Structures are given as structure tokens and as C-alpha cells.
Amino acid sequence: MTRIGWNQHMLRRRIETSLPNGPSPRPSFWIRALMVALLVATSWPARANDSAAELSIGGLQFVRTNDVAMESENLRIALDRISVRYQFANVTAKPVTLTVAFPLPDIDLSEAENIALPSNDPINFVDFETKVDGSPAPLTVDQRAMVGNRDVSALLRELKLPLLPIGSREIRVTDLPEATRARLVDDGLLMPAGMSDNGRQQYAPGWVIKTSAVRQQVFPPMRTVLVEHQYRPSVGSSPDTILRSSLRRSGALAQEVARYRKEYCVQDTFLAELDKRAGSNQTNSAKLQERRISYVLKTGANWAGPIRSFKLTIDPGGSDRLVSFCPGRLKASSATGNTLEYTASDFKPDADLKILVIGTF
């Protein structure tokens, strides 16, 4: 293994974290719980480490104001695309200029093997697009690499290395000059991560990517402005689900099952339907998998009053897929085809959305 890209290297790290002689960083509770569960449910697939964590992303954020009201928000969440339509009304007699931001989550490259990035674009890694009254409204993107509170972006650029090494910009650490490698290690940008098959030292990136996207938006007086925003979500995935009866009844997984039931408001009726499909076999003979989406909703409370009309549509991608989440004040309005719809009037979000989808994919 003399030439290895970040993705291949990360795969090796993921495998090593489940081995007794692997690197020292502790695997997540999810992986540790599954390792324990192997002793009591030996049929859990060896591919358990194929799980990927979702990033929590929301819609657009605006500076808190009493001059602009959100007339309506129409949010549609699917596994391949999230889209939001906002209608804003300037309630004053003069133009109001607000800073519009799309907060992208931090990416800790030391944990990159566990994160689902929807795009290989190192800058716009969720392929977001924004329109105002039907016309493209680009946001200015600023991206920085940080080690603790230290900005190391200039050093990476000096060494002609990408801030976010994904897609065509992957880094082959073994191809770097020894002096460059040594400098990155000394400055805390590379961390030792075990040995390769031929005995060479392997490294993992040690910096965090912080990305912000902003623009200035003018809201004319006494009129409505339509803002549309869409992007590809970061979707968490697992090749099985611990909510299958043979696994959720394992004492070793009790804490994780309880977390699932709380975070996704999993009801007994949901589990009963899951049991019908999964059966009671130790093996995942029905080939059920999980998909998870997190959506930051609480930022919708930044307006002059509540959101007057709110609609949420969830599209799991198939009528045979089970969906569970905590609706809070949202009321189910209809189910059309594959989609579920929820609505609320005078809505003030007080919690974010965490959506669980179980089925075949």
C-alpha cells in the first residue's frame, strides 16, 4: 500500500478501529455497542462499520429582525434533495437589508471516515442553490482550516494542499516530500494513524474545515419576497437496524435502542410493523437498512412573530419504507403516494428534525 488516497486510508482506519490492535482512538458508542452485541447476536453483519453519520444541516439563516415576517415556509425533505420555499414580507415602509447565511456544518477530517458527504465539490459540498424571486442569488463562500483556534489555511495553501481533500483533490500522503510531511506533523495537521501493510507510517488529517456562505439581501417595503433554497442532504446510513427485534432485545444494545426511541419518537406501532417485515431471525434476511437525516429547524424563530403558515413534506423514496420522527406541534395533514405531509399555523420552531427511514434501498 504505497499509494493511498484519503478515502482508501480512511477505510483502513475504519477497519482498524474495530480490531484489537488498531489505532488508539476509541470508536463511537454505536460501533462499540455493536462490537459487544456480536457476542450475543452473532448474526450482526460484519459490515456494521459501513455505517456513516449524517451532518446536521438546515435552511437559510437570517439576522434576527422585527422588520421582516415569514409569511410561509414550505419544507420538503427527501433522501436525495432538500428544498425550502420561504415567503417573506417587509412590514416596514422602508427597504430592509439583511445578512442571509447558509450555515454549513464543520467537518472534522480526523473523523471523516464516519461522515456522509453528498458531493465531491470541496467548496460547495452539498451542492446548494439559492434563488430570490426566481433569479439565482449566489452566496459568497468562505472556507478555513482550523487546528484548535489556529487558522492553518495559509499553511495548506503555501504547501499547495487542498483545505478539504475530497474527490479529485484527494491527498496521497506517501507522495508528499518528507520535509512537507514532517512540517504537517510538527504543526499538528497530520496525526499518526497506524502502519501500512509494508510497515510505513500512516497519517490522518488533524484539522477541521469551517465553511460559511453569506449574502446581503434587500427586502423592498410592503411587498413579499420569494426565496427558494435547495441542496443535497448528508444522509446517515447503516446496512442493518438495531430496531430489529432480535437486536433491540439485546441488553448490550439497550442504551442505543433507548436513544433511538427518544430521538426519533419511535412508537410501538412502528416497531410492530417493522417486526412484520423483518421477522424474528437473527440474520437480516429482509435486507432492511437505515437512512437518517438531521435538519436544523429552530432558526425559523428569528422573525417578527411566528411562521404564519408552515408545511413539511417527507418523501422517503418508497411507499414500503417506514418513517419515524418527532413532529412536535406539527399535525399530519395527508399522505399522498410516497409522501407524508404535516402542517402548522403560527408556528415557532423549538426543536430540530431528526428523521429515521427504514426499508430496502
Where are these regions (language model features)?
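Bacterial N-terminal signal peptides
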Residues: 32-42
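Proline-rich low-complexity regions
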Residues: 10, 29-31, 101-105
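Short non-domain terminal segments
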Residues: 27-29, 37, 60
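N-terminal secretory signal peptides that target proteins for export/translocation
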Residues: 1-29
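Intrinsically disordered, low-complexity regions enriched in Ser/Pro/Gly/Gln/His and often acidic
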Residues: 23, 37-38, 288, 296
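Non-catalytic, low-structured ubiquitin/UBL-interacting segments
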Residues: 3, 43-46
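Lumenal/extracellular ectodomains and adaptor appendage modules
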Residues: 46-361
